[in-house]
Amino acid sequence: TNDFFEKLEKTAEKCKVILLNRMYTLQESKKLDFIFQNKLWLSTENMQDLTKQGTLSLGFIGLSETIEILRKEQLHESADAENLGVEIVKALRTFADRFRQETGFNFSLLATPGEMISGRFAEADFKKFAHPVSGKGFYTNSFHVPVDSRISIYKKLETEGKFHGLCNGGSISYVEFRDAPMENIDALADAISYAVEQGVSYLGFNFPLDICRKCGHKGTFDTCPICASDDIKRIRRVSGYLEDLNYFTSGKKHEVASRKSNAII
């Protein structure tokens, strides 16, 4: 894995250059003059002062796939796999902290909820390397365990909780339910409490919602059990947004199709 960490550092250095170049380009842009001309930003008229308050984030997806390639097992499948995952994310955080010290700008580490890149990166890698890990059509978000892992709520939160504190640019974990868990609020409260204990800083609950476009019946179904219509609006959460499944990107459609519930309530 030494070669991997060397390549990881070189890639992080490239990201630093790209992020700084983007910030400097923005500072020189005249397209934002309207902010100052219309007194929408009152504290300064200097673009350098304005942009330095922002964050330059190193983001990552596909930690579990990385572990699978390096160790032939997934992130949640052994203590050694989890430890390697933590080591990788700690290295990324170290790079972000170093860049902040070197430049004086707000570099941070972001656990990316990839949308377009989730599928695009996997497709590009599969064309180049033909590795089965990228052949499924998407990469798993940030440090999440694979969506088809079927592990329990508690194991998922325990595994992912190790990473939240390292990602100072933002992070989120999800729990996947087979159906809407509205009849068991106590179970949701237990999940939230356990997430807090494990260091999870932001938690979301996922569950499918199907709505019949003909009669309005709601639930989870392929064909409406009330009117037998197959004209169904399917709402799912992806990358933090509730959207109609028809409008998902290719990679996210692959991800949703692979999802398995972490609990049945």
Where are these regions (language model features)?
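Long, C-terminal-biased catalytic regions of enzyme "large/alpha" subunits
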Residues: 1-265
